[in-house]
Curated annotation (Swiss-Prot):
Protein species of origin: Burkholderia vietnamiensis (strain G4 / LMG 22486) (Burkholderia cepacia (strain R1808))
Reaction(s) this enzyme catalyzes, per UniProt: (8S)-3',8-cyclo-7,8-dihydroguanosine 5'-triphosphate = cyclic pyranopterin phosphate + diphosphate
Known function: Catalyzes the conversion of (8S)-3',8-cyclo-7,8-dihydroguanosine 5'-triphosphate to cyclic pyranopterin monophosphate (cPMP).
Pathway: Cofactor biosynthesis; molybdopterin biosynthesis
Protein name: Cyclic pyranopterin monophosphate synthase
Residues holding substrate: 75-77, 113-114
Record-level GO BP terms: Mo-molybdopterin cofactor biosynthetic process
Length: 162
């Protein structure tokens, strides 16, 4: 892996010039988890949270988060996303909820940051909608799981782990 790309020779932050890169299909998948009390999990699972459909609202928030990534992360390029898909998986064993976001574009730079932002915003929305009953929820294990396209090629977390 090469050096940090967001700094020039003098050490000043700058937005990377992607003008000379080829446009290709870019895909990134990110995942994260929010752990909670069993009673909080039951409220979400049973659709009985006072604020409404927790996972439905969190899905919309995650999609919006992906779309607004360049507004939140200073050196991210604004991208025309072609797809944002967000899924939630209830996990009785934690108890908690896993969020998986897949983001796609046809462009000159990857969408890893958009996928990560989608997951974080989705999980933050779950926290916001349930914090009245459980302030101890923990957002954890947010990571890129897969990346496809671009000059550096395809990558998966499983392959990287060996």
């Amino acid at each position: 892996m090469s050096g940090l790309t967001h700094f020039d020779a003098a050490g000043h932050a700058h937005m990377v010039d992607v003008g000379g890169k080829q446009e290709t299909q870019r895909v990134a998948v990110a995942r994260g988890t929010i752990r909670m009390l069993p009673a909080t999990f039951a409220l979400i699972r049973d659709g009985k949270a006072k604020k409404g459909d927790v996972l439905g609202v969190a899905r919309i928030a995650a999609i919006q988060g992906a779309k607004r990534t360049a507004d939140l992360i200073p050196l991210c390029h604004p991208l025309a996303l072609t797809r944002v898909a967000v899924d939630f998986e209830l996990d009785d064993a934690l108890p908690g909820v896993h969020c998986v976001a897949q983001v796609e574009t046809f462009g000159r730079t990857g969408v890893e940051m958009e996928a990560l932002t989608a997951v974080q915003v989705g999980l933050l929305t779950v926290y916001d909608m349930c914090k009245a009953v459980d302030r101890g929820m923990v957002i954890t294990d947010v990571s890129v799981r897969e990346k496809r396209g671009g000059k550096s090629g395809d990558w998966t977390a499983e392959d990287a782990a060996g």
